[in-house]
């Protein structure tokens, strides 16, 4: 707000320049007025209706956040039942899975575009996994993925 008070003082002192250059002087306050209500409207919903603002924020967070924390924990307990994991390590694992998922999805999308097909099928996913993951890791991922798909289709 300090810059606004400084701007107001020169405007009140310089009445004569406004008379000389009315179009420029009139345009500048209009821009300032447009910016000020936008800031106030952004502040008012957060301060005025805290419950509604929180609900909107929660909905946005739920829609955007993809967490695999529960699944990471389940796999950890299957492999090492007596081992725990810190929250920082869990966050790192979650971001790692999100990165791999994004890479595989991007590669599968490219493959479907190369083949001029509108649908990404299990074949594109399998090829994308082979391209993204190295060596033995790709082989294990493909076998586990194939097993999961057959289990899903049979059920």
From Swiss-Prot:
A GO term from the CC aspect: nucleosome
Entries under Gene3D superfamilies matching the protein: Histone, subunit A
Purpose of the protein: Core component of nucleosome. Nucleosomes wrap and compact DNA into chromatin, limiting DNA accessibility to the cellular machineries which require DNA as a template. Histones thereby play a central role in transcription regulation, DNA repair, DNA replication and chromosomal stability. DNA accessibility is regulated via a complex set of post-translational modifications of histones, also called histone code, and nucleosome remodeling.
Lineage: Eukaryota, Viridiplantae, Chlorophyta, core chlorophytes, Chlorophyceae
Protein name: Histone H2B.4
Bias kind Basic residues: ranges: 29-40
Organism: Volvox carteri
Assembly and binders: The nucleosome is a histone octamer containing two molecules each of H2A, H2B, H3 and H4 assembled in one H3-H4 heterotetramer and two H2A-H2B heterodimers. The octamer wraps approximately 147 bp of DNA.
Positions of crosslink type Glycyl lysine isopeptide (Lys-Gly) (interchain with G-Cter in ubiquitin): 151
A Gene Ontology molecular function term of the record: DNA binding
Family indicated by similarity: Belongs to the histone H2B family.
Organism superkingdom: Eukaryota
Post-translational changes noted in the entry: Monoubiquitinated to form H2BK143ub1; may give a specific tag for epigenetic transcriptional activation.
Main location (coarse class): nucleus
Subcellular location: Nucleus; Chromosome
Chain residue ranges for the region called Disordered: 1-62
PROSITE patterns: HISTONE_H2B (PS00357)
SUPFAM superfamilies in the record: Histone-fold
InterPro entries in alphabetical order: Histone-fold (IPR009072), Histone_H2A/H2B/H3 (IPR007125), Histone_H2B (IPR000558), HISTONE_H2B_site (IPR055333)
Compositional bias annotation for Basic and acidic residues: 1-28
Key word Ubl conjugation present: yes
Keyword Transport appears in the UniProt entry: no
SMART domains linked to this entry: H2B (SM00427)
Keywords: Chromosome, DNA-binding, Isopeptide bond, Nucleosome core, Nucleus, Ubl conjugation
């Amino acid at each position: 707000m300090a810059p606004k008070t400084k701007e107001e003082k020169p405007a009140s002192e310089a009445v004569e320049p406004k008379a000389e250059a009315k179009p420029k002087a009139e345009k500048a306050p209009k821009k300032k007025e447009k910016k000020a209500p936008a800031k106030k409207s952004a502040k008012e919903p957060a301060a005025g209706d805290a419950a509604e603002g929180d609900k909107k924020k929660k909905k946005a967070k739920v829609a955007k956040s993809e967490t695999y924390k529960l699944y990471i924990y389940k796999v950890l307990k299957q492999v090492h039942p007596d081992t725990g994991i810190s929250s920082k390590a869990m966050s790192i694992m979650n971001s790692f899975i999100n990165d791999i998922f994004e890479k595989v999805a991007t590669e599968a999308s490219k493959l479907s575009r190369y083949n001029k097909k509108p649908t990404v099928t299990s074949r594109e996913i399998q090829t994308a996994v082979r391209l993204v993951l190295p060596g033995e890791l790709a082989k294990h991922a493909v076998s586990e993925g194939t097993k999961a798909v057959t289990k899903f289709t049979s059920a």
